[in-house]
Amino acid sequence: MDLHRAAFKMENSSYLPNPLASPALMVLASTAEASRDASIPCQQPRPFGVPVSVDKDVHIPFTNGSYTFASMYHRQGGVPGTFANRDFPPSLLHLHPQFAPPNLDCTPISMLNHSGVGAFRPFASTEDRESYQSAFTPAKRLKNCHDTESPHLRFSDADGKEYDFGTQLPSSSPGSLKVDDTGKKIFAVSGLISDREASSSPEDRNDRCKKKAAALFDSQAPICPICQVLLRPSELQEHMEQELEQLAQLPSSKNSLLKDAMAPGTPKSLLLSASIKREGESPTASPHSSATDDLHHSDRYQTFLRVRANRQTRLNARIGKMKRRKQDEGQREGSCMAEDDAVDIEHENNNRFEEYEWCGQKRIRATTLLEGGFRGSGFIMCSGKENPDSDADLDVDGDDTLEYGKPQYTEADVIPCTGEEPGEAKEREALRGAVLNGGPPSTRITPEFSKWASDEMPSTSNGESSKQEAMQKTCKNSDIEKITEDSAVTTFEALKARVRELERQLSRGDRYKCLICMDSYSMPLTSIQCWHVHCEECWLRTLGAKKLCPQCNTITAPGDLRRIYL
């Protein structure tokens, strides 16, 4: 297309100032004058088209009217003063066969303006015509006309000055390869490169022309539409096979993911959701993006499916329980109906109501008059089946000897409390003597070793306390009171003993304290009824006032106390 466009520009430029100077008029004139004189052959030069690169704009030094064919051709000396003896490439003088018959006379072409700026000139003599080669023979390539390394076209004028057409590009870039191939094909089509490439067989020439024409119309380097990579013509087949292999691997990878998800034991809900997701995928999405999205959302989607499967499992379990309950109720109703039918049949056979005697008189039971008997009255009848555990003996005494060992404390070990009134004290002593059956009281705790300064009862959870709580003393000051105030040395020793005791308590940490005396345990006891732990004296004084635990008010006997070791 560029060749025709260049030729069109040359026809309408200053080379042909006369509008009649066109190839069509030239043919008409030459055919009209062919019958006059056919002795002188003539070659008709075609309009000169400058080969121009496809992608690059180059500088053309002869686009104005000052340059004529005479300034570019060599060895033309027939016209004195206008053309000098110059050599020029004969490939520029290619003629079409229909325009140059062998017996054509070129003398009438003088009507097409033979001035110094015309594009068509007659040859002066026979030597000039014979000095040129035929336009249909392979042309010889001049020196510096075509370089294999750089596709540049050079011409020289009469002064020996060379003109370079084309731009030099780096040979390593794709653009240079494209320009090289395109320029080479353009020059070959226009006849500028006409050595062994032009001197081939007709079949090779036809194939080469097809390839060159395709290259002229599609001169851009191919680009992969998938990965947008610039490719060379030799890499097209290999790259296409690589893309096809990647495309074939995508369905297999997707099927493997689905097979992993559809492992044995997968619930139906998971299979259904996977199929819905597979159907809902966009058909226009690319395989790469779909695979990336599946991998990106696989974790969250698996979590969603697991939660939904667990929820459906719970719902199915509830439904199964409800069905079992309904079946059990149906069986019970069936058995009840069978019993009712049996009773009705029996009553119908007997044709009498239930009778009983009361005070020597026979009476009819009123419930038998109701339809359905006692069950029809709305009361619930209990089954006659007895529980097999109902015959077990009930242990009222609570013999825990085998489990907890023999009792360690008795009623004689209890420390009785003294009331404010003498009458209450006498009653307590009488009751205690009756319980002991005249036995002597225990001497486990003597008043001198008692932690309590008086016989007042400690406070319990019921709020019962003595009015002299301010006078109560704990084990912290009991040792000091035992010592007489007359001896200063004894007091000093007692203080040192107290300090050592406090140091031991600090070293132990005193993590365990009695909740009654608020001191560390002297002899801890626990009850097998409530398992609360208190000091021995605290337990015995509390049980002397009431048979209840001082912490939780659980009924506790002296025989329930057991010694423990912390």
Curated annotation (Swiss-Prot):
Pathway where this protein functions: Protein modification; protein ubiquitination
Transmembrane segments: none
Phosphoserine carried by residues: S390
Leading EC class: transferase
Annotated consequence of substituting R365Q: In HLD23; shows decreased beta-catenin binding
Molecular function as annotated in GO: beta-catenin binding; ubiquitin protein ligase activity; ubiquitin-protein transferase activity; zinc ion binding
EC number: 2.3.2.27
SUPFAM superfamilies membership: RING/U-box
Location of region: Disordered: 277-297
InterPro entries membership: E3_ubiq-ligase_RNF220-like, RNF220_mid, RNF220_RING, Znf_RING, Znf_RING/FYVE/PHD
Keywords assigned: Cardiomyopathy, Coiled coil, Cytoplasm, Deafness, Disease variant, Isopeptide bond, Leukodystrophy, Metal-binding, Nucleus, Phosphoprotein, Transferase, Ubl conjugation, Ubl conjugation pathway, Zinc, Zinc-finger
Coiled-coil parts of chain: 485-513
UniProt zinc finger (RING-type) residues: 514-553
Illness association: Leukodystrophy, hypomyelinating, 23, with ataxia, deafness, liver dysfunction, and dilated cardiomyopathy: An autosomal recessive neurodegenerative disorder with systemic manifestations. Affected individuals show delayed motor development and ataxic gait in early childhood that progresses to spastic paraplegia with loss of ambulation in the first decades of life. Additional features include progressive sensorineural hearing loss, hepatic dysfunction, and dilated cardiomyopathy. Death occurs in the first or second decades.
Complexes and interactors: Interacts with SIN3B. Interacts with CTNNB1 (via Armadillo repeats 2-8). Interacts with USP7 (via MATH domain).
Function: E3 ubiquitin-protein ligase that promotes the ubiquitination and proteasomal degradation of SIN3B. Independently of its E3 ligase activity, acts as a CTNNB1 stabilizer through USP7-mediated deubiquitination of CTNNB1 promoting Wnt signaling. Plays a critical role in the regulation of nuclear lamina.
Name of the molecule in the record: E3 ubiquitin-protein ligase RNF220
Organism annotation: Homo sapiens (Human)
